[in-house]
């Protein structure tokens, strides 16, 4: 309860004792970390999940995704997904993970979800489900464009997980958590960068262009 975790732009993952502000352990995750670290307890042991983008690696590289023992920094598993830099009008957009991963619950308690940017060609992006125990990719669902916004979850009366995520072209997707099947998608905004706020069966999310959307999932 007294440990905190953070990552920086050089890929350093640090565990800090919050009682005395001294470092406990360190892990090198290779590249710039924008995605927020998430933590989940398993049998009394905290585990942290982290991933990087492709920035200092150059035009192409690997998104390094890792699960670490929160007490000592030992690697439970680490997987790599090839990603690239996307160049548009003399601007570049780094690939990899930007969104905060979503820890699955209910019928998806064995999974963790996130999006990866530029993990293909021409600005491709996919929504991924990873097995918490091994890091194995259970499925990946192609989006119309890559995503930076974090996925959020909804549960029905059967405790089945459904996920909403927005991409950088302004599309919102409703995805079945267990299978990755896209139930619904529609273009609402211009570019979703902010993460949705969920209240009950309703989400609120802002896009570029001074627009805020309220969407009911029913």
What are these regions (language model features)?
Residues 1-218:
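Extracytoplasmic/lumenal domain signature
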């Amino acid at each position: 309860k007294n440990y905190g975790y953070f990552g920086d732009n050089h890929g350093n993952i640090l565990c800090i004792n919050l009682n005395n502000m001294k470092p406990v352990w360190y892990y090198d995750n290779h590249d710039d970390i924008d995605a927020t670290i998430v933590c989940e307890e398993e049998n009394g042991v905290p585990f942290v999940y982290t991933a990087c983008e492709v920035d200092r690696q150059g035009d192409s590289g690997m998104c390094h995704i890792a699960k670490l023992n929160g007490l000592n920094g030992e690697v439970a598993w680490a997987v790599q997904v090839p990603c690239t830099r996307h160049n548009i009008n003399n601007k570049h957009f780094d690939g990899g993970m930007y969104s905060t991963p979503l820890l699955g619950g209910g019928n998806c308690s064995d999974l963790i979800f996130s999006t990866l940017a530029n993990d293909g060609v021409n600005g491709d992006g996919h929504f991924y489900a990873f097995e918490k125990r091994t890091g194995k990719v259970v499925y990946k669902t192609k989006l119309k464009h890559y995503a930076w916004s974090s996925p959020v979850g909804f549960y029905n009366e059967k405790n089945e997980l459904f996920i909403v995520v927005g991409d950088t072209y302004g599309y919102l997707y409703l995805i079945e958590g267990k299978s990755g099947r896209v139930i619904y998608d529609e273009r609402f905004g211009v570019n979703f960068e902010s993460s949705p706020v969920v209240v009950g069966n309703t989400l609120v999310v802002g896009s570029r262009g001074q627009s805020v959307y309220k969407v009911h999932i029913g």
